[in-house]
Amino acid sequence: MRLVKKNVVINGIYEAGVRYPEPANISYLWNFGFFSLICLIIQLVSGILLAMHYSAHVDLAFNSIERLVREVDYGWLLRYIHANGASFFFIVVYIHMLRGLYFGSYQKPNAMLWVSGVVIFLLLIITGFLGYVLPWGQMSYWAATVITNLVTVLPVIGEDIVIWLWGGFNVDNPTLNRFFSLHYLCPFIIVGLVGLHIIFLRENGSTNPLGVKSHVDQIPFTPYFTIKDLFSFMIFLVLFFTFVFFAPNYLGHPDNYLMADSNVTPAHIVPEWYLLPFYAMLRSIPNKVLGVLALVLAIVVLAFLPFLTIAEVRSSYFRKIHKHLFWSFLALCFFLGFLGSQPAAAPYLICGLYSTIAYFIYILVLFPCIYIVEKMIIKTIMKTTVKKA
C-alpha cells in the first residue's frame, strides 16, 4: 500500500479502479459506459490491424478487403469484428444516452459531462460514415457522393469545400485517401474526448436511478462493481461473437459486396442502420438547406438539453408523465429509423416530415417543459388532500 501511495500513476489507477465510490443502487444500465470503452478498444485494435492490409486506392480497395477475407489468416475474423463492432458500439452508445435521458443524468451539475458525450457521439457518426466509404462497394461510393454533396448548402464556400473533399470534381481516388486518413485519425481524437468525459464524470460522481445525490450510500468500485462489470462483459461478448460468427452480415448491406460503379446507381441508397433516423430527417424535408440543417440540429440540439431543463426531480422513477413521454420518444426514434430504411416515396416522406417535427418538439418543448405540468399536478393533488383533511 505504501508503494501504491508513493507512485502517482499507480495511485491514480488504484483510486479510480478500486477505491472510487459508486452509488450502491445503480443498475446494469450504468454498465453501458464501460461497454462503450470496450467497443472503442475493440475498434482501435481491429482497425489498426485492418489498416495493415488495406489499400486506399479505388482500383485496389475492394479487392484488398476480399484478399484479406480469403487469403490472410483470420482476416475474415478481423473484418467482421470491426464491422459488427461498429454496430455494437452505436447500440451501447444509444442505450447509454437513453439511460441518461430517462434518469435525468444530463441535468446540472452534469451538464459538461453530457455535452462532452454529445460531442463524442457526433464524432462517432463522422467516423462511422468515413469507415462506411472505405470498402469501396456500391453503397459506399454512392453514400459518399450523396453525403459530401450536402456540404454545398454552405453559402460561398460550400462548392470549394466539396471539391477539396473530393480532390477533384467527383468522388475518386483522392477522396478515398482523405477518408482513410481521417477515419484512422478520428478514433484517437475520440480517445482524448473520452478521457475528458471521464474527468467530468469524476468531478461530480456517478448518478443513480433515484436521481438523488448522496455521499452516504456509496460503496467502493472494487470488488462490487468490478464483478458486476465482468459478468455483464461476458454476456456482451457472447452476444457480440454470436453476430461475428453466425450472422456477420446481418447488420450490413448486401450492395456493398458489389464493387463501386459510378455508372450504376443502387435502387435505394441507404447509410448504415445506426444513421437511419437522421437520414429519414434529411430526406423528408423537400428543401435541401433545411434538410441538412435538420440533420445537424437533430444531434447538436441534444447538447442544449441540460440548459433547457429546470426540473428539481431528475429521475423518471418519480415522474410518471416524463416516463411515458420518454417511451413515446423512443418509439418515435424507432419509427424514424424504419422510415429511413424505406424508399424515398409516399407515404414515407410525409410521415418522415411529421416525425421530424415531432422529434424537435420533444427535445425543445416537451422534455424541458413537462416538469412545469408535473409540478402543477402535484400542487393540485396536495391542495385537494389538504382540503379533505
Swiss-Prot record:
GO terms for MF: metal ion binding; ubiquinol-cytochrome-c reductase activity
Membrane topology term: Multi-pass membrane protein
Domain of life per record: Eukaryota
Cofactor: binding details: Binds 2 heme b groups non-covalently.
Pfam families xrefs: Cytochrom_B_C (PF00032), Cytochrome_B (PF00033)
BP GO terms, sorted: mitochondrial electron transport, ubiquinol to cytochrome c
Record's subcellular location: Mitochondrion inner membrane
Residues reported in the UniProt entry to bind heme b b562: H82, H183
Misc note: Heme 1 (or BL or b562) is low-potential and absorbs at about 562 nm, and heme 2 (or BH or b566) is high-potential and absorbs at about 566 nm.
UniProt record similarity statement: Belongs to the cytochrome b family.
Record-given protein name: Cytochrome b
Species for this entry: Dictyostelium discoideum
